[in-house]
C-alpha cells in the first residue's frame, strides 16, 4: 500500500516504513504528526484518487530528526567586469518515518 501526500508545497510518494525528508516542521523529535492532504491512496488492486483530496485519507508519521541539507553553492558574475559573487545555502529539513496510511 502506498500514498501520495502534500507537505511543504511538495508531493511525496510513501509506503509504511519509509523514511522521508520534508521541509522543516515545527514538531519535536519523537512526536507523531498527521498529514491529511492525501492526494492518492493505492493498495494492491484499487487506487483511490482524490478530487483534489481523498476523503478520510490520512498519513501518520513519527518525527525522527531535524537537520540541514548539503550546501548548494550559487555563483553570479558579470562578464568582462571582474565582478563575481559566491553564495551558499543549506535548507532545513525534518526527517519522518511513515507509521500508518489510512484511506
UniProtKB/Swiss-Prot annotation:
PROSITE patterns: RIBOSOMAL_L21. One of its GO terms (biological process) is translation. InterPro entries: bL21-like, bL21-like_sf, Ribosomal_bL21, Ribosomal_bL21_CS. Keywords: Ribonucleoprotein, Ribosomal protein, RNA-binding, rRNA-binding. One of its GO terms (cellular component) is ribonucleoprotein complex. The keyword RNA-binding applies. GO terms for molecular function: rRNA binding; structural constituent of ribosome. Part of the 50S ribosomal subunit. Contacts protein L20. Belongs to the bacterial ribosomal protein bL21 family. This protein binds to 23S rRNA in the presence of protein L20. This is Large ribosomal subunit protein bL21. It comes from Shewanella sediminis (strain HAW-EB3).
